Amino acid sequence: VPKEINDKRREENERAAELHSSFLMKMARRLYKMHQEKLLTHHNDETDWNRWKYAESLRRNFFFVNMINILGAKARLLNEQYFEPLGDDIVLQLPLPATEHMWRCCDEEEWAIAREHAMRRPANSPPVARTLRELLEQDKAGTLDASTLLPVTRLIFACAKVAPKGDSLGDL
């Protein structure tokens, strides 16, 4: 296939991706507004398994939408000049993902045990960041040990660190 045709096809795909990305951001923001109270309730504070499952699923999806958006811009699949952040009020305030043990529970009883276990911390252990904002503050203060983070949280953190300028994550 000639280079001209490949270049034209790539440009068309980039334009389509930019349009779809904008739609995805808009729908994510709308969904956040509809469920904001549930979404902002931390794992330690939620006692209803069904509400927790729903909110945790949504939270993880918001983080993935944000990561895809950032990585799409950084990989030049989306034009970085048109980068549209998901929104700090969403990404920085959401509780970070729960432990894998909690996430993989199959019933309420198993979840309650996993939740109880996750809430136990040694008395002299450093505070665990509950949000991306707290995680970034710990990093800035030099008190973050990224090796202690859950794999999904490490991905969220890494994407926040490489966010394009103009997204205040990229300006932190």
Protein language model features and the residues they cover:
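C-terminal transcriptional activation/regulatory domains of eukaryotic transcription factors
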Residues: 1-12
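C-terminal effector modules of eukaryotic transcription factors
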Residues: 12-172
